[in-house]
Amino acid sequence: MLDISIAIDGPAGAGKSTIAKIIGNKLNIMYINTGSMYRAVTLMALKNNIEPYDIESLKALINSMNISFNGNNIIVNGKDLEEDIRMPIINNNVSKYAAVEEVRELLVSMQQNISKKYNVVMDGRDIGTVVLKDAPYKFFITASAEVRAKRRLKELKEKGININFRDVLKEIKERDYIDSNRKVNPLKQSKDAILIDTSNFTIEEVVDKICNIIKKD
């Protein structure tokens, strides 16, 4: 399969990362979780006591980060950060750092450079509208806030993180608001993206639906 790029956008907890990951494996193309990149920046910023408003320090931090992927795991400066970036403290702060214009500009540039070198499936908040505007395949994956909160709660409990449903739902709704209302590249469905509500479908059913659309071409 030559010269293919697939953009998958949607709110937190909709299942887009899991879906994109499986599609990448099925089609044998590179999967890039752009959310992991923002999470990694958030992790490193918190470790270095850099606030979201400290633009110059954030830019210097990002420029010092050598970001790559090993399978589905994000590697920064040679260290696997996949587990660290899934901690609740990152969930609670990532939208603040992701809303910073200069952060988005630097990471979008990295993402676009990757897409020029490889066939990719990327998931995030602004893939179809900004990062891969010309992607031939665009999908917007969503689900109700309650369904997404249940999924996130299950995921966190499986990792041994003890948290209640009400707190997870609150976090999901707060992230939705921040992601949809930020000034720079807000979460929104691209006009040419296919909308898929996953509330009543399994991951496998959604993957099959997307793969069938791609294979028809």
Curated annotation (Swiss-Prot):
It is found in: Cytoplasm. It catalyses: CMP + ATP = CDP + ADP; dCMP + ATP = dCDP + ADP. The keyword Secreted does not apply. One of its GO terms (biological process) is pyrimidine nucleotide metabolic process. GO terms for cellular component: cytosol. It is an enzyme of class 2 (transferase). Pfam families: Cytidylate_kin. InterPro entries: Cytidylate_kin, Cytidylate_kinase_dom, P-loop_NTPase. CDD domains: CMPK. Keywords: ATP-binding, Cytoplasm, Kinase, Nucleotide-binding, Transferase. SUPFAM superfamilies: P-loop containing nucleoside triphosphate hydrolases. Its EC number is 2.7.4.25. It comes from the Bacteria. Belongs to the cytidylate kinase family. Type 1 subfamily. PANTHER family: CYTIDYLATE KINASE, CYTIDYLATE KINASE/PANTOATE-BETA-ALANINE LIGASE. HAMAP family: Cytidyl_kinase_type1. This is Cytidylate kinase. It comes from Clostridium botulinum (strain Okra / Type B1).
